[in-house]
Amino acid sequence: MTTLAATTRHQRWPSNRSEVLADLDVPFGDLVRDLALPVERLTDDLGELDVAAARLGRSRQVWFYHYVADPVPSTLVRVDRGDLDASTLADLRDALGGDVPVVWQNPEAGEPDRAGADGTADPGGFAAAGA
């Protein structure tokens, strides 16, 4: 199993660039509480956000974050641009217990996971609607 450990937020990403890896259908507060991660409040050009930093495996830096004004209680995951791939997403899911529902994932992290929380292959009902 891949490990996930709390760490301090780094000021720089190893590649000098980060990307959103995924949007998890898990409330930020629940996730950081369950993982016992310290939370830091920051402000960027989109507003205030709560951030919790962690180390995935031996060296990959991961930020879990949520914009305070966002009414949707999901958790965004940011990683170094050099770690934006399917193995990072797979390791993250493994570290979180394997069954974390992913609302959206960066296309560069592999094929999107279209399974809904109930395990169906069409969570939005688009096939039945003819979309």
Regions found by a protein language model. Name each.
Residues 73-78:
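Beta-strand/loop substructures that line and gate deep hydrophobic ligand-binding cavities in soluble
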Residues 1-71, 82-126, 130-131:
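A cross-family detector of function-defining hotspots
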